C-alpha cells in the first residue's frame, strides 16, 4: 500500500549525486491506494501496481541538461515520528525520458504500533489486573490482523513489562475482533518493586519480511487510587 494522507504522507527529496544540489522536494499526499487492486489482482510483469487507481504520489519536473545520477529519498509516515523510516535509491535520469506507470517506487519497512490502554500518564494501582491493549498497522495504515492481507499469524506481537532496564515479564498478546487491537492481561507490581514506575512495551516483529515496530510508555505505580477531586 501507499503512504497517503491518513498517515501524514511522506517527504520526498531528489538530489544531484555529483554536486549535492537538491533538485526537487515535497510531500507525497493522497489516497493509500486500492487494496484489492494492489494486493489481490493478478497482473503482467510490466503492468503498473500502484498507479492503475488513484493513490498518493509525488511528481516533479526536473530541468536536466544532461544525463544525471540522482538520489531519490523518502521518509515517512510523517504523522508518526516514532515510527519514521527513511530509504533512498540512486539512478540515472535522462532528459526527455519521462518516467511512466508507477515511476520510481521506494519501499519503507516497519509497523505502526500504538498502546491504546492504559493511556500514559495514567497511574496504575498495585496488584490490579490490567489489560494491555495495542493496535498494529502497516506504515500505510492498513490493519494487521489474523487472516488479513497482513496476517498477524505470520508475525510475533508481544508485550513486555520493564522495571528500569530489566524485562520482568513478557506477555503473549491475542487479537480482539471488537476493538481491532491486540491485548494481554497483567498484574501491576508493588511500588516497592517499581519505585519509578513501570514501562510497558509492545513489539511487532516480522524477521522474514524485515518489518518491525515498537511502542512504549512509562506509568507510575500507586498503592491505592487517589480520591476524586471535588469541585
Explain the meaning of each model-derived region.
Residues 92-144, 223-231:
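Short, compositionally biased P/S/T/A/G/V-rich stretches that sit at domain boundaries
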Residues 4-11, 147-157:
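Short coil-to-beta strand junction motifs in C2/discoidin
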Residues 18-26, 163-172, 211-212:
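Surface-exposed loop/edge segments in extracytoplasmic proteins
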Residues 187-194:
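Short, surface-exposed loop/turn segments at beta-strand-coil junctions that are enriched for proline
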Residues 1-28:
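Sec-type signal peptide cleavage vicinity
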Residues 66-70, 155, 194-201:
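Exposed beta-strand face motif in extracellular beta-rich ectodomains
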Residues 55, 62-85, 204-214:
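Short acidic/polar inter-strand loop motif in beta-rich domains
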Amino acid at each position: 500500500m501507499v503512504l497517503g494522507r491518513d498517515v501524514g504522507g511522506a517527504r520526498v527529496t531528489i538530489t544531484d549525486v555529483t554536486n549535492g544540489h537538491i533538485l526537487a522536494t515535497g510531500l507525497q499526499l493522497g489516497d493509500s491506494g486500492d487494496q484489492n487492486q494492489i494486493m489481490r489482482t493478478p497482473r503482467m510483469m510490466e503492468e503498473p501496481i500502484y498507479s492503475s487507481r488513484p493513490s498518493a504520489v509525488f511528481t516533479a519536473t526536473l530541468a536536466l541538461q544532461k544525463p544525471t545520477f540522482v538520489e531519490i529519498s523518502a521518509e515517512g509516515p510523517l504523522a508518526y515520528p516514532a515510527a519514521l523510516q527513511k530509504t533512498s535509491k540512486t539512478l540515472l535520469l535522462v532528459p526527455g525520458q519521462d518516467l511512466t506507470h508507477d515511476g520510481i517506487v521506494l519501499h519503507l519497512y516497519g509497523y505502526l504500533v500504538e498502546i491504546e490502554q492504559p493511556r500514559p500518564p495514567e497511574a496504575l494501582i498495585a496488584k490490579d489486573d490490567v489489560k494491555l491493549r495495542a493496535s498494529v498497522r502497516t506504515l500505510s495504515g492498513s490493519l494487521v490482523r489474523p487472516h488479513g492481507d497482513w496476517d498477524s499469524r505470520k508475525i510475533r506481537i508481544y508485550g513486555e513489562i520493564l522495571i528500569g532496564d530489566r524485562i520482568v515479564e513478557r506477555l503473549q498478546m491475542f487479537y480482539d475482533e471488537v476493538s481491532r487491537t491486540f491485548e494481554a492481561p497483567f498484574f501491576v507490581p508493588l511500588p516497592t518493586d517499581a519505585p519509578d514506575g513501570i514501562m510497558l512495551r509492545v513489539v511487532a516483529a516480522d524477521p522474514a519480511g524485515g518489518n518491525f515496530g515498537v511502542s512504549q510508555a512509562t506509568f507510575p505505580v500507586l498503592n491505592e487510587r487517589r480520591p476524586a477531586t471535588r469541585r
